Every structure is written in C-alpha cells, then in structure tokens.
C-alpha cells in the first residue's frame, strides 16, 4: 500500500513539474521576446534618426532577429510597440508583428499587419480593448510617423481576406488582424490616416 501511495505522489510531482515547466517556457519565452523587442526598438529608432540626418535616398535595411523590418507600430492605449517584419509566415509571427498585405508602411492604400493574440497581452493580445476613435502610430523606414484613427472593428472567418481591401480609395489605411475565439475567427481593426 505504501508503495502505491509513494508512486502516486511521485507521478503527481512529475506532472506538477511538467506543467510548471510548460508555463515557464510559454510565458518566459514571451517575456524574453518582449525584453528583446524593447532593446531592439531603441537601436532601430537610433538607426532611423541617423538615416534621417544623413538624408539618404535609399531606405535603410534594418533587421530584427534576422528578419528585415518595414517600420514600427505603436498603439499607445494598449501600450504596445513592435517592429514590423516585412513578411508573414509561422516563424516571423512568433517573433513580432508582420506585414500581411499591401503597400509599404505609410503609403497610399491598405497596409495590413498580423500578430498573435497572446494570452499574456503581448503582440496583439490586447487589441480586444481597442475602440473606434483610438489611435495607432505607424513609423516607416524614412522615419515618418503617421497617426491613424480606428474607424471599424469586426470579426471574420479565417478564410475571409476581404479586409485587405481599402475602404476608401486614395487614403492611407492600416488593418490589424489577429486570431480570436479560440482561433475560430479573426479580429479585424481598421484605421485611417488622421488628416
């Protein structure tokens, strides 16, 4: 009887260790990534300022974790700021916000970005708290920052890509896409340049 009791205790301890390790790996990884994002953003912003003072004709080639970036997105209300990687795939989405579709950052058209909806609030994990009228700042590689105002928030099926279309021709728009409802839907947040 004592052997069975000891075996049950040992199994429970191992299970507890595995669960704790999984939590630490999941959230610890996000925490470390956030620290790296913060330190890299400082370097990226310094490089953008340096390029601006040098009046270079070509855009700087800046990278984050080995991936080229197109700019920086900042949403003050939910306290997020990330470099935008220039393409979307499984690997880049683990690292930062990514370009999904559209022109270069701050150009005419619908610049569409995607990011994970992390439960710890990182990446686009807090976009559910955004409302119509909230602001998004987008800085491109020319160090030009444009402020956008949210005008539409809605949910779509994962296969629906109609959100990449511009709502109004000749305007600058940004669309944020993230998963929601247990990955069954996508939360779409659309914003237009404030003129």
Regions found by a protein language model. Give the residues of each.
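Solvent-exposed, non-transmembrane regions of membrane-associated and secreted proteins
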Residues: 2, 6-195
